Amino acid sequence: MTQAQDHAKDHAMNIGVFIPIGNNGWLLSENAPQYMPSFELNKQITLKAEQHGLDFVLSMIKLRGFGGKTEFWDHNLESFTLMAGLAAVTSRIKLYATAPTLCLPPAIVARMASTIDSISNGRFGLNLVTGWQRPEYAQMGLWPGDEYFGRRYEYLSEYAQVLRELWETGRSDLKGEFFQMEDCRLSPRPQAEMKIICAGQSAAGMAFTATYADYNFCFGKGVNTPTAFAPTVERLEEAKAKTGRDVSSYVLFMVISDETDEAARAKWEHYKAGADAEAIAWLGLQGAADTKSGADTNIRQMADPTSAVNINMGTLVGSHATVAALLDEVVTVPGTGGVLLVFDDFLKGLDDFGTKIQPLMRSRRHVTGEALAEVA
């Protein structure tokens, strides 16, 4: 048994799925599966995740795509209405929607969240995003100007304060620079504590998360380097030390698995060979538009040309046993609560994960309840 495996058996890891609310999931490749988003597809994915004992699903919000030959993310559902539908057809799994905070006032989001809390019987939470892609908001006349890049988290801090006040007390009178509440009311309030996710990686994003959020989502890094994200978690730990709050990190990985390492690697190489250069170039241009937030933002990593075919998220490529062992290593990084997974082929990938990968994971023994064979 490796040291990582020994550690993993004593540390349970939560696992969620980043469901494909946009076309083609997270692969900017002509050689990857091509599909449109639909409620039916996301329902099947979410029910499979629930069936296999996974802990949560999250949907993003994307209001304008990257174009290219694959029309990457040009076709997207809306996050809250999708999750409301999923809340009605599931029974156990937790559900997180993403709020585009430049579009939706916080009092409206607080009420929508309370409604889905009612539909789901307390299984709903919220991911807050500031908005980094100017064309998403400029097309609606809602872009506040490029100076916003440097003040995104000041805006989001007031937004989160309004949410917390309404959820916890049913009333907000916040008088801020961006929001002015006047005896704003919310009832009914959520029956369960409403959890907030943030995915900010900049210093300002980390400070916000440590102050207002419950979970921080970050990108994994590299191919089959499952602990390379550790410096990001360390920065959150430093931010948490200033606020004294309990905030755990969740790491985004793409899983590309097959019966053998060689077969999985062949799929990965095939996807890379079909990379949609036009869509990737557009992503790079959008990432360069923010000259105020520093070099450590999510969009900087997404637009890096190293592995832009899957927006540079951490990638786990290998046999089912290889991927299980790599995932067990993730939880060895202190401060890590779990992972958020995407798959090249979501339906098959989830079934393979549930039946062939998860049973081999020491960090998921609390779900499988099985005595595990040694993984080489």
From Swiss-Prot:
Enzyme Commission number, as recorded: 1.14.99.46
Single GO BP term: uracil catabolic process
Top enzyme class: oxidoreductase
Reaction equations catalysed: uracil + FMNH2 + NADH + O2 = (Z)-3-ureidoacrylate + FMN + NAD(+) + H2O + H(+); thymine + FMNH2 + NADH + O2 = (Z)-2-methylureidoacrylate + FMN + NAD(+) + H2O + H(+)
Highest taxon above the source species: Bacteria
A GO MF term: alkanesulfonate monooxygenase activity
Residues annotated as binding FMN: 61-62, 127, 136, 152-153, 202
Keywords attached to this entry: Flavoprotein, FMN, Monooxygenase, NADP, Oxidoreductase
Record's function text: The FMN-N(5)-oxide reacts spontaneously with NADH to produce FMN. Requires the flavin reductase RutF to regenerate FMN in vivo.
Family recorded in the similarity comment: Belongs to the NtaA/SnaA/DszA monooxygenase family. RutA subfamily.
Name of the protein described by the UniProt record: Pyrimidine monooxygenase RutA
Source species of the chain: Methylorubrum extorquens (strain CM4 / NCIMB 13688) (Methylobacterium extorquens)
